[in-house]
Design a protein with these regions (language model features):
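Conserved Class I S-adenosyl-L-methionine
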Residues: 1-12, 88-117
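Extended basic-aromatic, gly/pro-enriched interface segments that bind polyanionic ligands
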Residues: 1-38
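Conserved phosphate-coordination/catalytic loops
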Residues: 17, 58-61, 105
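Short "lid" loop at the C-terminus of a central beta-strand within the Rossmann-like core
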Residues: 31-32, 82-86
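Residues at alpha-helix caps and immediate loop-helix transition turns in enzyme cores, especially N-
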Residues: 39, 59-63, 90
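A short SAM/SAH-binding and catalytic strip from SAM-dependent methyltransferases
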Residues: 43-58
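Conserved beta-strand signature within the Rossmann-like core of class I S-adenosyl-L-methionine
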Residues: 45-47, 71-83
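A short glycine-rich, Lys/Arg-flanked "PGG" loop and its adjoining helix->strand segment in the class I
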Residues: 60-73
Length: 118
């Protein structure tokens, strides 16, 4: 996208190369799959953006349980979707951030922060 294209906003986060080299992306179906991890192998942070809108409430609840199972106790999950809490998952919503974007019209992004409690 060209710099300054009308109707688009560019946002970026600078991450140190040493941190980037330690990131291990995992491609999986979050509704039906989870990694079997020992407690010391679980993640401190999982980020899932723009994926839950493709699933209904039941599937989102299953995904929430799977995410919790892959987090260390006290670990965090960030998503731009508010997930239903219809099934006990061990995740509690601890924060939501509103990020307004301006342009031709104002759009607000939401970042939901969940923490594993168990």
């Amino acid at each position: 996208m060209p710099q300054g294209a009308p109707g688009f906003a560019t946002r970026a986060v600078k991450i140190r190369p040493a941190v980037v080299s330690r990131i291990k992306p995992v491609d999986m179906n979050i509704v039906f799959q989870r990694l079997s991890l020992a407690t010391d192998e679980r993640f401190d942070l999982i980020i899932g953006t723009n994926i839950f809108l493709y699933y209904g409430g039941f599937e989102q609840s299953l995904a929430r349980v799977n995410v919790a199972a892959m987090l260390k106790p006290g670990g965090f999950f960030l998503s731009n979707d508010k997930l239903p809490d219809t099934v006990p998952s061990g995740l509690e919503q601890v924060m939501v951030s509103e990020i307004p974007r301006t342009g031709a019209r104002v759009i607000t992004d939401y970042i939901y922060c969940y923490r594993r409690t168990q």
